[in-house]
């Protein structure tokens, strides 16, 4: 599956995570937990059986630009905001920080390579259950 240009392997519609298998950075290749709150949306998309997790109505690849122009801007106009999709990462990190999620888990979830120490990058191993517990705190 592809998630707006991020190649990933979805581990069946009953799993609450996916694996990013191609990324711009090494830390981008990771397990991404799917929060219980958003799982029904991912399950619906996955169960559509399309090659792409997020896709156009006719099943084609959804580029970032296409998504942004076709959906994001109209939603932002509707609710009177001027946020960019990347702002959701900031919000997610802020919400997890407010819920006192371990900073290493936050970095692993968002794939933030620059802020990780050598210890975090190389020696800190976390499992999917820990990532799910962290994301579900928000």
Residue ranges with predicted function:
Residues 32, 47-53, 57-62, 69-116:
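Short, basic (Lys/Arg/His-rich) helix/loop patches that form interaction surfaces
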Residues 1-38, 56-58:
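Basic, Lys/Arg-rich DNA-contacting stretches centered on the C-terminal catalytic core
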Residues 40-41, 51:
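Extended glycan-interaction surfaces of carbohydrate-active proteins
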Residues 20, 54, 123, 138:
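Short clusters of hydrophobic/aromatic residues that line enzyme substrate/ligand-binding pockets
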Residues 39, 110-137:
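Catalytic-site neighborhood detector that most strongly recognizes the C-terminal catalytic loop/helix
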Residues 64-65, 131:
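Generic alpha-helical segment signature
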